[in-house]
Amino acid sequence: ANLTGANLTGADGIDPRRHNDLLMLLDQPGAICAYKLVRGDYGSPMGYGPLYYTVGTTLTEADADTDATHDCGRGINLATLPWAMREWTEGHRIMLVEFTAADIAAIPLGGTFRVRKCTVIKELDLVELGLVEPVAKPKRVRKPKVAA
């Protein structure tokens, strides 16, 4: 049977390790990087609190939702790069963040997951990602040389 898109929340006998590639994050030693889609002002696009993801900032959410059946919940919701690029709209930014496996609160299906703590490393270049066109530089007009 093709169960693509099926909601199996609460189904018995389902082993998420067979279906959720992001569970590999739990086995990673040391620092792990992921992505955060933010508004133009670096604020979180969701309404769980005024979190701002500026470079160098360490964010914490001690009371993050640990229920993996909740796609989006209280906490610092991060994503894969394909997810962030797919959900990106004009005026938004994509940030690279760093965390550890111990910081992970929940890993639902779908390309997103929640952490309790992360540090913002850098802002990704939207031109390099192919999400926006490069800004055209104005052409320099050369002044003709005046004969002496």
Each language-model region and where it sits:
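A detector of tandem-repeat and repeat-rich interaction/domain scaffolds
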Residues: 1-14
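Compositionally biased, low-complexity repeat tracts
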Residues: 6-9, 52, 71, 126
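Polar low-complexity intrinsically disordered regions enriched in Ser/Thr and small residues
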Residues: 8, 43, 59, 113-114, ...
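Long, positively charged binding patches that form subdomain-scale interaction surfaces
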Residues: 15-73
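ADP-ribosyltransferase catalytic core
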Residues: 61-124
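Long, highly charged low-complexity segments enriched in Glu/Asp and Lys/Arg with interspersed Ser/Thr
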Residues: 117-139
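Arg/Lys-rich low-complexity patches in intrinsically disordered regions that function as generic
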Residues: 139-145
